[in-house]
């Protein structure tokens, strides 16, 4: 029985990145032998075991044969005579098909180290095309490492999309990969790769249709709404590691994809149109409610936030109430970050100041300091409390904004 460290742990060690978890492949043994040594079985579709002391995963070397559409149609062979190279050959990318022996030596039959050095994502074998999830994984690794996809791999991904393989992706898996991609260092690369192979139109049509839609050059020097959207996502990634903020940034302008072409380059009412599209996207991918709620707010109100310095105190208070700032101050901060990303996600304007966010923060703090307790203590009841609370908060906002403007 031979044991090798495989996959992401080897890759990340070679890249000098922290290793979060270790997976091992075991060659030349059987499930019964591992059970006899105290390993605990956990794999449903193929033999995977947990080490009795470390609880790390040990999988029997295996081969996989495609038997049906999608990512579940596989027949697995984990016999003792399956070799290490055969196991590595079933893996998706060469950078994930490197093994480390117990003595520290590396086994790299598919040139993964060379591709790591060159920053290239390359498929190991034509079997890459048997699992549509690999389209998403390749794009996600591009978002993590900022690597390029090898031309032949991109061509294979395009062929998979043309063959309809991407249509077999289940919503939960798409969302899982999207959420992970949003948390990577270069999330815009995920969408660039999907668009390059044609998968964006199949998986995220609401985003694909933004490309080629013009905006006024005065406000958007980049003109193209799709390019703007990816720039906003890029800025959001610099502003915050919060994937909810990044998702809201990604979806803030979906409504522009539905603007009648005769109205271009203007997009009147795109905020409300965008809300409907955000809800459709979230329902289709079964996006968690927290992501959806923030994305809806940003789609609906981002233009109003950009006008914050021109808003009257009463309008500012209405905005604070509509985004539920007093009950959800943390989400209000997420909301402002996504709006700032939109304002700065424009060619040549990436570093411009965004005083609107700080003005709304000041207004919120001033209004939040006004509570109903003194009003209740003074004997007010019901609607009288609400009316007085509103008036006092408007007054507090007016004073805070006036002081800020100097």
Swiss-Prot record:
A Pfam family per the record: HD
InterPro entries: CCA_bact, HD/PDEase_dom, HD_domain, NT_sf, PolA_pol_head_dom, PolyA_RNA-bd, tRNA_CCA-adding_enzyme
Catalysed reaction equations from the record: a tRNA precursor + 2 CTP + ATP = a tRNA with a 3' CCA end + 3 diphosphate; a tRNA with a 3' CCA end + 2 CTP + ATP = a tRNA with a 3' CCACCA end + 3 diphosphate
Gene Ontology terms for molecular function: ATP binding; CCA tRNA nucleotidyltransferase activity; cyclic-nucleotide phosphodiesterase activity; magnesium ion binding; phosphatase activity; tRNA binding
PROSITE patterns: HD
Positions of the HD domain: 225-326
Cofactor: Mg(2+); Ni(2+)
SMART domains: HDc (SM00471)
Domain of life: Bacteria
UniProt cross-references to NCBIfam families, sorted A to Z: PRK10885.1
Subunit structure, as described in the record: Monomer. Can also form homodimers and oligomers.
Protein name per UniProt: Multifunctional CCA protein
Organism field: Nitrosococcus oceani (strain ATCC 19707 / BCRC 17464 / JCM 30415 / NCIMB 11848 / C-107)
Gene that this polypeptide is encoded by: cca
